[in-house]
A protein has these predicted regions:
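Acidic/glycine-enriched edge-of-secondary-structure segments
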Residues: 1-18, 39, 179-188
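Glycine-rich beta-alpha loop elements in corrinoid/cobalamin-binding modules
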Residues: 13-126
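Long, charge-rich, low-complexity alpha-helical segments
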Residues: 19-20, 24, 428-439
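Glycine- and acidic
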Residues: 33-41, 179-185, 207-214, 269-275, ...
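Proline-centered flexible-loop/turn and helix-kink motifs
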Residues: 60, 76, 84, 207, ...
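Radical SAM [4Fe-4S] cluster-binding motif and immediate context
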Residues: 130-295, 308
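A structural motif corresponding to the C-terminal lobe/cap of the Radical SAM core domain
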Residues: 189, 222, 233-236, 240-405
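Short alpha-helical segments that sit at the start of domains
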Residues: 403-435
Length: 439
């Protein structure tokens, strides 16, 4: 029955995806655009290639330019072979090549550049950006106009903004499963002055309340101290966090406007965290779960399993701990994805890793274009994976029902807290102490 339900859900997703694709093709074609620019990210092939194929089938003169984090010279050669509908691929992290290419195409001129791959010529090298401050403040006017035309709630609109690229932690020694794709293993960040200026401009132009920072990780503590002026904008932010932060950091982030985050806990086993090289421990992760709940910052996080060197004790050690955490944000259980160029990838035999996703519709993909992999599951550990899954499912159910670690009664002159751990305990607060607790 469960398999039939999953199959039905897959069919509905496929149907909806096709309807969305048809609408996108219709809108682009009706715009009578001469050039389509597309930012290709990892795992984005299926939708992008089908979009390009359909657009070219109804307008063979449409020029398609692709750029983005997927576009290295090596991968660009593979991509344009798999999808000949693409005319140009930019292997350039800066905007200069793109601007010159578009201007020349609009004037029907040819343009030769060592950072551009076409069907006739491969890019010779990658142009890596050296700093971010020269990048213009992003223009969302067409998006905002569309929101207004559709009469959607503008006050709920979320706009992305980039403060940094790369991972400062990974620049030193990355997590075991993350290679950040080899050539991009560097960290760049905009100056505090640039960030504050851009955010003020976005706030003034679009009256936005929500920003999603696209950074892989929040900046270091010293940087956050220099952008405290963000607080004055009164906006709400999403930011990805590392787990090696303290209460002072959490308080500062909340004051700045952080209301929602994905945080890289990954596990509640100190041994597993050491293997991953997360720079944290199980007790620190639990402490941060408490802090983030206390400061009313909503979080998502993944509990990872399925490493090639998995140990049974990594998972068994946390099974008895989880019932004490039902009042805190639960994780999603995920089989780990291994990035190309990561420590695990480089230390694994080719037959030990399976590519993720890319070959669902495109069997022609070679290993050179694969980015994400999974290790083969150890059959001897399936029972402990199942136990962990059941525990996390119970955690989610308890949390969604408002599970409380303690019961609070405020129907007398103060607050009475009854807590049940290994024993039953009672706490009484009156006056100012009660008001502080209930704040």
């Amino acid at each position: 029955m469960k398999k039939l339900e999953n199959f039905s859900n897959c069919l509905n997703v496929l149907k909806n995806a096709n309807e969305i694709l048809k609408r996108v093709v219709f809108d682009i074609h009706n715009s009578q655009a001469k050039i389509l620019t597309y930012s290709l990210t990892f795992g984005d092939y299926n939708f992008a290639f089908e979009l390009f194929r359909r657009l070219k089938s109804i307008n063979e003169n449409l020029i398609i330019i692709v750029g983005g984090s997927m576009c290295t010279p090596q991968l660009a050669k593979e991509i344009i072979t798999l999808c000949p509908e693409i005319d140009y691929i930019l292997c350039d992290e800066d905007v200069d090549s793109y601007k010159k290419l578009v201007l020349n195409l609009l004037q029907d001129n040819t343009y030769d550049n060592p950072y551009i791959t076409s069907r006739e010529k491969d890019a010779l090298k990658m142009n890596k950006i050296k700093e971010l401050d020269h990048l213009p403040c992003p223009d969302f006017s067409d998006y905002v106009n569309e929101i207004e035309n559709l009469r959607l709630k503008k006050e709920a609109m979320i706009i992305p903004y980039e403060i940094s690229r790369g991972c400062w932690w990974g620049e030193k020694k990355s997590c075991a499963m993350c290679g950040y794709f080899g050539y991009q293993k560097c960290f760049l960040i905009k100056s505090p002055k640039k960030v504050i200026s851009d955010l003020k401009m976005l706030k003034e132009l679009y009256q936005i309340n929500y920003i999603r920072f696209t950074d892989l990780v929040e900046p270091r503590r010293e940087y956050l101290e220099k952008v405290d002026d963000i607080t004055e904008l009164g906006m709400n932010f999403f930011w990805e966090l590392r787990p090696n932060i303290n209460e002072e950091d959490v308080a500062r982030l909340r004051k700045m406007g952080l209301f929602y985050s994905q945080i890289g806990f990954e596990s509640l086993s100190s041994d597993e965290l050491e293997y991953i090289h997360k720079g944290t421990t199980a007790i620190n992760n639990i402490y941060l779960l408490i802090l983030l709940m206390s400061y009313k910052i909503r979080i998502d996080w993944n509990y990872l399993y399925g490493f090639s060197d998995d140990k049974r004790e990594w998972y068994e050690s946390v099974l008895d701990i989880i019932p004490y955490l039902y009042h805190l944000f639960p994780p999603a259980l995920r089989q780990v994805w291994i990035n190309r160029e990561s420590r695990i990838f480089n230390n694994s035999e080719k037959n030990e890793l399976n590519p993720v996703g890319s070959k669902v519709f495109h069997e022609g993909f070679s290993d050179d274009i694969e980015v994400f992999y999974q290790t083969k599951i150890n059959s001897k550990l399936k029972d402990v994976y199942r136990k962990l899954s059941d525990k996390i499912d119970t955690w989610k159910k308890c949390f969604s029902r408002g599970y409380q670690l303690c019961f609070v009664y405020d129907n007398f002159d103060g607050v009475h807290i009854m807590r049940k751990y290994e024993k039953e305990e009672h706490f009484f607060f009156r006056g100012v102490e009660a008001e502080i607790y209930l704040y």
